[in-house]
């Protein structure tokens, strides 16, 4: 785990609440607007930022994030420009961890060694690469860890106790528990099942466990945050951005403020989570 990531989780745990992890697609709807969104997230209460890298074949993404990726690609967003987003953000914010989330193909084409060097220079703290299983750790995970970049793995309801140790073997930063099988943006499952799943993962690792896929409202964040170390919100933010755009997909005056308002509400939800659990 990078020092910045470790410090952020420790600081938030000391406050007695879960971490709020916010995802958005880099370059959606354009570079400058997404930079403004990224800069607004911590001010609205985000603790960790997941910065999406657009890809033409995003197999794990639901319709909303697929459309966000298409908008970003249409606007000219690339992996290099996504690293530039991180670099520009990091010049003003030294404390908020950045996790790049995407697929292996753009990294492979960019060049693994070059990518990792540029990611370190840009201030990236972690990676989530959804199509690289543990059996392929030598491709990117191990080199990333050697550079000091966390490699965050996804666990799902179908990850059984035989598979889980392999998934966790080289995981660092935090574990991302996908609270349902399927694609992003699905409905939220039974909270009691999530609490049991978090406890099961924690019996195998000392890493924080963050829960995502399906978290859309402050109430969702409050319920999930009662048992998880962190709450991940993505589709709701992407939908908020999309709803603010013109029919042509261009930014409006409501785009950034709309995201800020949503994240402030989600932040209030995670801050109420442990209070609700204690009642």
From Swiss-Prot:
Keyword tRNA processing carried by entry: no
Highest taxon above the source species: Bacteria
Catalysed transformations (reactions): (1S,2R)-1-C-(indol-3-yl)glycerol 3-phosphate + L-serine = D-glyceraldehyde 3-phosphate + L-tryptophan + H2O
EC number: 4.2.1.20
Pathway: Amino-acid biosynthesis; L-tryptophan biosynthesis; L-tryptophan from chorismate: step 5/5
Gene Ontology MF term list: tryptophan synthase activity
Purpose of the protein: The alpha subunit is responsible for the aldol cleavage of indoleglycerol phosphate to indole and glyceraldehyde 3-phosphate.
Assembly: Tetramer of two alpha and two beta chains.
HAMAP family, sorted: Trp_synth_alpha
The protein, known as: Tryptophan synthase alpha chain
Organism from which the protein derives: Sinorhizobium fredii (strain NBRC 101917 / NGR234)
Gene designation: trpA
